[in-house]
A protein has these predicted regions:
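Vicinal oxygen chelate
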Residues: 2-5, 19, 31-32, 86-88, ...
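A detector for short, charged/polar N-terminal pre-domain segments
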Residues: 5-16
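Core segments of cupin and vicinal oxygen chelate
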Residues: 27-79
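Short glycine-/small-residue motifs
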Residues: 70, 167-170
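Short acidic/His/Gly/Ser-rich catalytic and metal-binding motifs that mark active-site loops
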Residues: 81-85, 179
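Short, solvent-exposed loop/turn and secondary-structure capping segments
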Residues: 171, 180-183
């Protein structure tokens, strides 16, 4: 079984040559506002626009800044509003089955704190740094120091929302995962772990 690890690791998919995400397609309430926010706040660049047949809406593509990864947005003339806890992440962090809970962007660990301050300076409401800790079962460890952590914190995260209410995350891996990180059986639809 493969594991997630910091960029540049040697994990290989031998089944398919998946090179990353081509794009992720989301739905915008207001295309103009959405494009402006992603360009002005996150620095992405609009690279492709199209009108959908029959006046149904629009489909726009933004490049994340590396010429490869992108985010696309649909705008539909009669799209229903998102529902927290169903199509959007609810106040308790849950969302419905088959929906996207949040979108995490990989950022350099050495720029993590700087990027949080940069978002705040742009008027974005950002959470405190969440240091996901093994010793706290994924819970938050309030203080993080790479020199003294000893591998307890596995990812650092900050969360914020785009104009459509989509929860976004800036995340940086702080350790490479190994076999010791695979300690839980997956739950079934009934909430019980699968037995071997």
């Amino acid at each position: 079984m493969g594991v997630m690890a910091p960029r540049g690791s040697s994990i290989t998919n031998t089944e398919f040559e998946l090179r990353g995400f081509n794009h992720l397609a989301l739905v915008a309430r207001d295309m103009k506002e959405t494009v402006a926010w992603y360009e002005d706040v996150l620095g992405m660049k609009l690279v492709k626009t199209m009108e959908l047949p029959g006046g149904r809406g629009q489909h726009f593509f933004l490049d994340m800044g590396n010429g490869v990864d992108g985010i696309a947005f649909f705008w539909f003339a009669d799209a229903p509003e998102g529902e927290p806890g169903t199509s959007l992440q609810g106040p308790n962090g849950m969302s419905a089955i088959g929906t996207m809970n949040h979108l995490a962007f990989d950022v350099p660990a050495e720029k993590f704190d700087e990027y949080r301050e940069k978002l705040k300076a742009k008027g974005v409401k950002v959470t405190m740094a969440i240091n996901h800790s093994d010793s706290l079962n994924g819970g938050h460890k309030p203080d993080y120091d790479a020199a003294t952590d000893g591998g307890d914190v596995f990812v650092r995260s900050i969360y914020f929302k785009d104009p459509n209410g989509t929860t976004l995350e800036f995340a940086c891996w702080t350790k490479t995962f190994g076999p010791e990180d695979l300690q839980h059986e997956p739950a079934t639809a009934k909430g019980t772990p699968v037995t071997a």
